Amino acid sequence: QHSFEADPSVLFFSTHQYPHYPGTGRATECGTGAGEGFTINVPMEAGEGDDDYRAVFQKVLVPAADAFKPELVIISAGFDAHRDDPLASMGLTEEGYADLTSIVAGIATRHCRGRLLSSLEGGYNLTALAASVARRARPEGIRKLRA
């Protein structure tokens, strides 16, 4: 977040349990200087799950990305929001991760010819992590919202 907070050429979007370590990511943290408004933090309450995340992605991320028109989309995928992960207290499932990936893939398809990079960030229940990564990588899941 802080790497790009003053950069209007990067749209940074984050959903995360709040309050939680490291204590950043308040909704009021929205960038600085020329980058103000290009950082979007959506704090989530403990226990929120698939429907809550889908709603935030559809109501907040999609309109922001459509206005921004990215040339490349990068996902830093934190799987510690999985309902079985010991680090956080969120309620995402494998299907939820697949749906969120499809939403983001749709943004990449509309604005940057599908240029999408995804990296693994977190996830500490290895069974849930493996299942979530495998589920979101299935082509039918990505095609679902790209069409």
Regions found by a protein language model. Name each.
Residues 1-147:
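A general "terminal functional-core" signal
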